[in-house]
A protein has these predicted regions:
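N-terminal small/polar loop signature for handling phosphorylated ligands or for N-terminal nucleophile
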Residues: 44-108
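Residues on a specific face of well-ordered alpha-helices
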Residues: 64, 82, 86, 123-130, ...
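Flexible glycine-/small-residue-enriched beta->alpha junction loops
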Residues: 93-145
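Single conserved hydrophobic/aromatic residue that forms the stacking wall/gate
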Residues: 167-175
Length: 175
C-alpha cells in the first residue's frame, strides 16, 4: 500500500483509519522517524496513544517500526498528550510520539512528534520517507519497555502548584 502525501501536515500527520493511515503505513512512518532519531543521536522514544479504537493497533505497529530500526521504545500506553510531552521532556531525551486523532472525527487518527524538544512537521517525515529511510542501515532490534508514568506526572503537577487562599473582608455576602 502506498502512502498518501496529504496525511502529512504542517504540524502533524493525520488521516482516516484504515484508508489513509493504517498499520502498514504507520510502520513506514516509524522507520522514517527512526532515521531522524539516529541523525540526532536519540536512542529512546516515549510513545503513547489516546483512546481511539484504532490507537492500540497503530501504537503497536509504530513501536514495531521503531524497534526494527534500532530505536528503544518506552510505551507509556493510554495517556493524554500533555502526559506524553512530560514523559518525553523528563525521561526520554526530550523526544516522544503521540498516536492521536486529536479533535478530528472518530475515523481519523494521527501522530504528533517532538524530537530534541522540538515539534517535527509531518512534511519533514514525508521527505525522510522519500529520501532517507531507504538508506537506513538495519540495526539490531531494540527493546520495548512499558512504563506507567502517571504517578510521576501527578506528583510533578502537585509539587509545582502554589495554591494561595485569599481572605478578604466582605468577600462573600449573604445578601
Amino acid at each position: 500500500m502506498g502512502i498518501t502525501s496529504s496525511i502529512f501536515r504542517e504540524y502533524d500527520i493525520r488521516g482516516t483509519y484504515p484508508d489513509e493511515l493504517n498499520e502498514e503505513v504507520i510502520e513506514q512512518i516509524a522507520f522514517a522517524i527512526a532515521t531522524k532519531c539516529h541523525k540526532e543521536a536519540i536512542g529512546t522514544l516515549a510513545v503513547g496513544r489516546d483512546g481511539r479504537l484504532s490507537g492500540e493497533s497503530l501504537l503497536n505497529a509504530f513501536c514495531k517500526g521503531l524497534v526494527k530500526a534500532g530505536i528503544k521504545v518506552n510505551n507509556i500506553g493510554l495517556v493524554t498528550s500533555p502526559l506524553l510531552y512530560f514523559a518525553a521532556k523528563k525521561e526520554h531525551s526530550k523526544s516522544g510520539v503521540m498516536i492521536t486523532g486529536s479533535h478530528n472525527p472518530k475515523n481519523y487518527n494521527g501522530i504528533k512528534m517532538v524530537i530534541n524538544d522540538k515539534p517535527v512537521a509531518g512534511t519533514e517525515i514525508l521527505s525522510l520517507i522519500d529520501n532517507e529511510s531507504k538508506k537506513l542501515n538495519i540495526f539490531k532490534d531494540a527493546e520495548i519497555t512499558f512504563t506507567d508514568i502517571k504517578e510521576n506526572y501527578i506528583n510533578e503537577v502537585f509539587n509545582n502548584i502554589n495554591i494561595c487562599l485569599l481572605y478578604t473582608s466582605d468577600a462573600a455576602d449573604d445578601t
